[in-house]
């Protein structure tokens, strides 16, 4: 009887061992499903245009979402001009030199961004579209009317310091600060913004400067060009890096 009991206990032990081995084998053969990367992209605006606010839920969704830019981009550009640049231009809205200067600012961005493989089309936004007191919402609506995917707004401010010297040529030093924001028109989100400041110092050249005012303009225009060259490069780099 004792031998029979020992036999049953031994058989029971083998069954338990077999069950554990089977369970362990099943556990080892289990392969968890791969973790999916978050693909939650924001596809529409969550801003309420009526009261210019956004709900708490909208804030959370925006902060938890990503912006997916198109592979090919229609880019609208607006020069949100500052009055600081017109100090040397009488009746500046009709002054040919001033208008050419403003156009040259836009050309810096056009030249830099037109060679970007993602930029399909560059659209210049006319000033008459934005009115006298534009805000971020009305600017977005203007970009929609141009069917732009992205909207680049830039502005330039500058100041000049002039030194009169008794026995040397006069000098002019100018500082320019350029600001830019890039808006995703579909969502109203601004994925890129930057501020660049540069300085430029020149000495009065009697061959080309008829007055000290010409020297100051030359210094100012040089500083502005430096800021816009750098700023346009940063915008271009952002568009290249975006996936």
Descriptions of predicted regions:
Residues 1-8:
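Bacterial N-terminal signal peptides that target proteins for export
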Residues 132-191:
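Surface-exposed short loop/turn segments
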Residues 70-153:
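N-terminal segment of the mature soluble domain
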Residues 98-102, 132, 136, 171-173, ...:
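Solvent-exposed, acidic/flexible segments
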Residues 16-19:
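C-terminal motif of bacterial Sec signal peptides marking the signal peptidase cleavage site
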Residues 21-69, 185-194, 200-243:
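C-terminal/domain-edge helix-coil "capping" segments
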Residues 88, 163-167, 239:
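A short acidic (Asp/Glu
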Residues 112-116, 142-146, 157, 230-242:
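Structured segments of extracytoplasmic/periplasmic soluble domains
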């Amino acid at each position: 009887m004792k031998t029979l009991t020992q036999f049953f206990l031994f058989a029971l032990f083998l069954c338990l061992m077999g069950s554990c081995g089977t369970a362990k084998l099943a556990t080892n053969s289990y392969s968890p499903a791969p973790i999916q990367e978050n693909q939650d992209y924001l596809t529409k605006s969550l801003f309420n245009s009526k009261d210019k606010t956004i709900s708490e839920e909208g804030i959370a969704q925006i902060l938890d979402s990503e912006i997916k830019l198109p592979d090919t981009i229609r880019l609208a550009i607006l020069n949100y001009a500052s009055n600081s640049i017109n100090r040397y231009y009488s009746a500046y809205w009709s002054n040919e030199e001033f208008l050419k200067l403003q156009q040259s600012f836009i050309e810096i961005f056009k030249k830099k961004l037109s060679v970007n493989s993602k930029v399909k089309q560059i659209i210049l936004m006319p000033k008459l579209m934005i009115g006298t007191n534009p805000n971020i919402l009305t600017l977005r609506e203007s970009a929609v009317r141009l069917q732009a995917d992205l909207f680049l707004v830039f502005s330039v401010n500058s100041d000049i310091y002039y030194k009169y010297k008794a026995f040397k040529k006069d000098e002019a030093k100018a500082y320019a600060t350029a600001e830019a924001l890039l808006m995703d028109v579909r969502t109203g989100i601004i994925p890129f913004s930057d501020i660049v400041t540069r300085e430029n110092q020149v000495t009065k050249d009697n061959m080309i400067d008829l007055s000290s005012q010409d020297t100051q303009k030359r210094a100012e225009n040089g500083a502005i060009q430096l800021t816009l060259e750098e700023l346009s490069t940063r915008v271009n780099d952002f568009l290249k890096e975006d996936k």
